[in-house]
Amino acid sequence: MVKKNIVVVGTQWGDEGKGKIVDLLTDRVAAVVRFQGGHNAGHTLVIDGKKTVLHLIPSGILREDVECFIGNGVVLAPEALEKEVAQLEDTGLKVKHRLKISDACPLILDYHVALDQARELARGNKAIGTTGRGIGPAYEDKVARRGLRAGDLKNMSQLKQKLQTAMEYHNYMLTNYYKAEPVDFETLWAKCQAYADLIVPMLADIPNLIDLYNKEGKNLMFEGAQGTLLDIDQGTYPYVTSSNTTAGGAASGSGIGPCQLDYVLGITKAYATRVGGGPFPTELRYDVATDEGDAVGKELGTRGREFGATTGRQRRCGWFDAVALRRSAQVNGLTGVCLTKLDVLDELEEIKVCTKYRKDGQDVFLPPSSADEYELVEPHYETLKGWNTSTVGIDSWDALPEEAKVYIRFLEKEMGVTVSILSTGPDRSETLVLEDPFEV
């Protein structure tokens, strides 16, 4: 078999079920590479009924013969890393010798978290809905060339000088602009010395490791976080994350050449969800706190257990948006789609799919680039018949209800991409592979 470099990305607003699919496919790879985002991601894996939630470490860590790389596109929170390593090793998994970290990873430090939270508070009802974990401010420091990187932990005297300079700037912003408490230098400096003990032994030249594995003919998996519609450039700006969540980010965020990427698998929920603020044309509004709103929105949220793995926040739920998926197919160059959570729709009498928007009396078949324009569109739906029977655990195409097959084929037509994998439940075993990405 010829080696394959597979990229796995979310095609919606995140929470599509990427972790399960990466874990499923990692029995065929030598390493899994995270290439963007930080510990704001929450990848939930269920294996033999046991649930594991990962925020930073690649999902391949649960397979003991798979190495895990954290690429330069990831912003690294040392405390989150330490906690996750400890939790995994408490279960008997050996983590540290299999985890390699790029020395170019920007570090998320206490002042990034303080800034993130102060900004969200200042935005009031215009809040973006960040996780408040310092992701955005850390990426800002990277682009402004004042960020501290994982490799800086190798030289503590230089690190101390860089930290003092960075903290002067950020504490000035915190105290004078946001009227918030400053971050204490001595406390953070002591933490950084402990961070070095944890991280420095795991530092590695990730682009070189990727190149060596490719030359040896080994398969690699590149694991995205969040989703395409949260991409800093292609998403519903400014209600986006601070990194490139699309397939192109796999190259810039890890150091692999783009021509080395062989297959782009887009993880796509059979309906739509979104966390936080921002446009969502197909939303079925329901508030779990008051138990008020749309009945189907409630059912999707309840059956789909739509609460964030990282924050616990209620996810907004809605019908499948094929307009948004067309954009995802374009900007990712999707080879195939993995459709997840089909079973959540099992008890619906009818299922709607948004096939186009209407704006100013015109049909719109691709999403607008700005959030302001996005808020003005109206969804146009096609209605399909539900199947009213369980699809949980179905492991063959022929065993699917006829109406479910019709729904899947309809989505394929509207997206312009073939469904290659079907997830019929949370467990690793509840998956139907229609087209093997490693065999294409």
Curated annotation (Swiss-Prot):
Named cofactor requirement(s): Mg(2+)
Residues annotated as the enzyme's active site: D15, H43
UniProt binding sites for substrate: A309, T310, T311, G312, R313, Q314, R315
Reaction(s) the record says it catalyses: IMP + L-aspartate + GTP = N(6)-(1,2-dicarboxyethyl)-AMP + GDP + phosphate + 2 H(+)
Any one Gene Ontology cellular component term annotated for this protein: cytoplasm
Residues given in the record as Mg(2+) binding sites: D15, G42
This protein's UniProt keywords: Cytoplasm, GTP-binding, Ligase, Magnesium, Metal-binding, Nucleotide-binding, Purine biosynthesis
Binding site for GTP: 14-20, 42-44, 315, 341-343, 423-425
Cited InterPro entries: Adenylosuccin_syn_GTP-bd, Adenylosuccin_syn_Lys_AS, Adenylosuccinate_synth_dom1, Adenylosuccinate_synth_dom2, Adenylosuccinate_synth_dom3, Adenylosuccinate_synthetase, P-loop_NTPase
Positions with a binding annotation for IMP: D15, E16, G17, K18, N40, A41, G42, H43, T131, R145, Q226, T241, R313
Pfam families: Adenylsucc_synt (PF00709)
Xref: CDD domains: AdSS
Compartments in which it is found: Cytoplasm
Principal place of residence: cytoplasm
Enzyme Commission (EC) number: 6.3.4.4
Matching SMART domains: Adenylsucc_synt
UniProt GO MF annotations: adenylosuccinate synthase activity; GTP binding; magnesium ion binding
Cofactor comment text: Binds 1 Mg(2+) ion per subunit.
Quaternary organization: Homodimer.
NCBIfam families recorded: PRK01117.1, purA
Biological role: Plays an important role in the de novo pathway of purine nucleotide biosynthesis. Catalyzes the first committed step in the biosynthesis of AMP from IMP.
Name of protein: Adenylosuccinate synthetase
